Regions:
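Active-site substrate-recognition segment that forms the wall
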Residues: 1-38, 47, 53-55, 61, ...
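Short, hydrophobic alpha-helical segments
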Residues: 64-71, 150, 224, 327-331
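Helix-loop-beta segment of a Rossmann-like dinucleotide-binding subdomain
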Residues: 39-48, 128-132, 155-161, 181-214, ...
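Core beta-strand elements of the Rossmann-like FAD/NAD(P) dinucleotide-binding domain
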Residues: 236-244
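A non-catalytic, amphipathic alpha-helix used as a structural packing/dimerization or gating element
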Residues: 137-145, 214, 318-322
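Dinucleotide-binding Rossmann-like beta1-alpha1 core, especially the glycine-rich loop
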Residues: 120-195
Length: 357
């Protein structure tokens, strides 16, 4: 079977840029009691790099457990969740299922978050972790929850991902949690102008515009209140009326908590082409291409230390020129150094275990 080649003849619908919250010592997930006000208990959940959607349900379950244990001890009934990206929304979902009163405080709501700019493949990319056992649990819980949501309006579907080289992010899953996803199948890639040796993986596609909207809508239906608020420092967080606070602010955590680990912005670009229903596969490891209901997503890039969310036309064109060459419908051009798959970017895109803080 030959898979259809993407149509690159029409200009992009739009270009987008988002900023991944990459934490040098691994993502942070822990509960702490405030030294200045012992009644305040803060669960920190941030620094997930490019793996936010992939890990979301898994880390949210661990956040919920910390909140439940604290509420059982203190008899608090109200919880503040800071942030309305995928980490905040999934955490709020599981916490409100405990019967607690949840209020989400956020500077930006779901349409304007980094999560909304994500490509959506389930593959834990560009993230460091410090506890292998907990990370395995996160992977298992997250994947199985997404898998159970197929066909329920969450924008989740199973997909083949064709790659010309091993995919290190999916291989992490294969190696750490055998059997969670199928092992990759070596094969000649099934494309008219790209019949080189490669691999076929099987994973999930989570479409952020559908998934985030569904979470947001369900929370509103369950009487979770949303309030727009910016937190400038730790004092502004501790001034909240809730005693249990869940910090899912991503890069915003730099402003509100003392953290010795580097929390670094990593800018990524996407180009969105018109949706093409005939494309039912994913492609990665030499450029990536994720056909979704709203668009065909072309990515991605990796600019370390850049906090800007402004798309750059020249970078967008580089992405398009490169992927056209890969699929044999344009001149072959070298992989841009800014591309996430370029070897120079590996120190910041690898998913690996570190000694965490």
């Amino acid at each position: 079977m030959i898979e259809p080649t993407p149509d690159f003849t029409t200009p992009p619908l739009e270009a987008k840029a988002g900023v991944r919250p990459w934490r040098e010592n691994g993502y942070r997930l822990e509960g702490t009691v405030s030294s200045s006000n012992p009644r305040k208990y803060i669960v920190h959940n941030y620094g997930h790099g490019g793996a936010g959607i992939s890990l979301s349900w898994g880390v949210a379950s661990q956040v919920r457990d910390l909140v439940r244990d604290r509420a059982t001890h203190t008899h608090d009934t109200a919880v503040a969740v800071l942030g309305s990206g995928v980490m905040g929304l999934t955490a709020a979902t599981l916490i409100q299922e405990l019967g607690l009163k949840v209020t989400v405080y956020a500077r930006e709501f779901w349409q304007d978050t980094t999560s909304h700019v994500a490509g959506g493949q389930w593959a834990p990319s560009s993230v460091r972790y410090s506890d292998e056992g907990k990370f395995k649990d996160v992977l298992k819980i997250a994947y199985r929850r997404f898998e159970s949501d197929i066909g329920k309006g969450f924008g989740v579907s199973k997909k083949f991902n064709y790659t010309p080289a091993p995919d290190p992010y999916l291989d992490v899953v294969v190696n750490l949690v055998p059997g969670l996803i199928p092992n990759p199948v070596p094969m000649n890639l099934p494309f008219e102008h790209l019949a080189t040796p490669g691999f076929r993986y099987e994973t999930l596609l989570v479409e952020p515009p559908i998934f985030l909207k569904k979470l947001n809508d369900d929370l509103h239906r369950n009487n979770v209140e949303f309030k727009q608020k910016t937190f400038a420092n730790a004092a502004s967080v501790l001034s909240l009326q809730e005693n249990i606070i869940v910090n899912c602010t991503g890069l915003g955590a730099k402003d509100i908590c003392s953290d010795p680990s580097k929390l670094i912005p990593i800018k990524g670009h996407l180009a969105l082409l018109k949706s093409q229903a005939r494309l039912t596969y994913l492609f990665s490891r030499n450029g990536h291409l994720f056909p979704r209901e709203d668009a065909v997503v072309i990515g991605g890039t990796n600019r370390v230390g850049d906090p800007s969310t402004n798309p750059e036309p020249a970078v967008t064109q580089q992405l398009l020129d490169h992927i056209k060459g890969v699929f044999g419908v344009g001149p072959i051009v070298p992989l841009p150094r800014i591309h996430i798959d370029h070897p120079d970017n590996w120190p910041y895109v690898a998913t690996e275990k570190v000694s965490g803080v």
